[in-house]
Amino acid sequence: MFKIGDIQLKNRVVLAPMAGVCNSAFRLTVKEFGAGLVCAEMVSDKAILYNNARTMGMLYIDEREKPLSLQIFGGKKETLVEAAKFVDQNTTADIIDINMGCPVPKITKCDAGAKWLLDPDKIYEMVSAVVDAVNKPVTVKMRMGWDEDHIFAVKNAQAVERAGGKAVALHGRTRVQMYEGTANWDIIKEVKQSVSIPVIGNGDVKTPQDAKRMLDETGVDGVMIGRAALGNPWMIYRTVQYLETGKLKEEPQVREKMAVCKLHLDRLIDLKGENVAVREMRKHAAWYLKGVKGNANVRNEINHCETREEFVQLLDAFTVEVEAKELQNAKVG
């Protein structure tokens, strides 16, 4: 367990902020599987200040999710500070996180996201201004560098600490790598040794064993899990249990997976309405179905679903089909 500012986390497992994924429906589901902290998807500072309707919806927080970190991004100090003040005063988020890791060109060309990684002095200036303007603890999520020739992870993390930031989450890849190659955990270890604020490691934590290895090898305070949790909140539960007991829980059976998928769908419908939710849930269903044998047909059919009823019927029929095959195989065996 560790604290970010005055916010106590019940364990060391953190859900990463993933754009287009980490809305309240997904976060709450992951929270119920034991995450110590969940992070909301990044929100544009300018969109907050323009009072954009879609963006205001992205700021919605279910109190059952807490503690929660709400992430903002931007390239100008003035707008970032004003957006942070809005989040501070108008949401129940526990932590305000600043994105310095997003590698996507449309973000970096606005001098936001990973573009900050090139200038530790700018990081200090921006973080300091936000810290001075808000009451909630401020954290930063960053990558280790822009490219192999511009890795300032230690200086950047130290700048965050000097500016009053309460924690750093570090992804061990450069901006140029995007999500390719392997994460450099040695850099994460260096950063942990260079600052006294909590450091959360991120990158290539695909199994509970990976999480323990990251903690052991780098000394970080927490592990951040992103893509491995897509359609798989059991990854969070199994990691928490493994870190606490040393025992590995079994993977879920298809009926349990489809039940949670349906719960996720219903929460998304409550959040966004049936039309939007069903379409958005198609990608999530593909993730929930990953690893289940014979899922090709149902995935294809789900991609044409327009209603909750269709969606649920397909998942239920697939569950019965898989269980029948498993029973048949057990008899043969």
Curated annotation (Swiss-Prot):
Gene3D superfamilies: Aldolase class I (3.20.20.70), Putative flavin oxidoreducatase, domain 2 (1.10.1200.80). CDD domains: DUS_like_FMN (cd02801). The active site is at C102. Its EC number is 1.3.1.-. Its cofactor is FMN. GO terms for molecular function: flavin adenine dinucleotide binding; tRNA binding; tRNA dihydrouridine synthase activity. InterPro entries: Aldolase_TIM, DUS-like_FMN-bd, DUS_fam, DusB-like, tRNA-dHydroUridine_Synthase_C, tRNA_hU_synthase_CS. It is an enzyme of class 1 (oxidoreductase). Catalyzes the synthesis of 5,6-dihydrouridine (D), a modified base found in the D-loop of most tRNAs, via the reduction of the C5-C6 double bond in target uridines. PANTHER family: TRNA-DIHYDROURIDINE(47) SYNTHASE [NAD(P)(+)]-LIKE. Belongs to the Dus family. This is Probable tRNA-dihydrouridine synthase 1.
